């Protein structure tokens, strides 16, 4: 996804599901996240400590809601940036009022879809496979999907590919050694032979991983099933 605004902007978004609920969670990420807390609730709390505060519209002085305020200074946050989390009552009007006020804060804008995860990736907090795992976890509808998504979000695929990368680097080092000691035939041939063995083992391992009949995709996407039969035999029920 291409984001049209610069990553220097401070972004905000409703992180909980849209609609009526008990609690609405709004996140703010960027250089001005701490200023947002100061503007709405007079002062920011201690890092990673939830406090109950009045949230006030700085333009009118009117009360938006009472809610929990959390402050996560970067880089120790999901995005790696300064991050604020505001938890308010989950009525549509409350969430809309809070988002409206945040939109008036200079330097702040509504986040585009996936932008929080994109910033986490850009700042080295997650890799692409973990970002995909988080998306799958949010979309999971079955227990099997949940377990698979948690494994990927937890870095299982990342650690596997890092191990493959280490083996490739080792093989490359052996080839470079063979080049450096090309005048010593025994050393060069031995290094090349070891490199070939490493690459062959790695190819077999990658092939075995890929040759799984797309089980992971099937678990994630589910099955398409056709119910066929004569009319009025119970297909609908």
Positions of PLM-derived features:
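A glycine-rich (often HGG/GG-containing) alpha/beta subdomain
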Residues: 1-147, 151, 155
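Conserved G1/Walker A P-loop phosphate-binding module
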Residues: 20, 24-29, 39-43, 176-237
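Long, non-coiled-coil amphipathic alpha-helical linker/lever segments
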Residues: 125-209
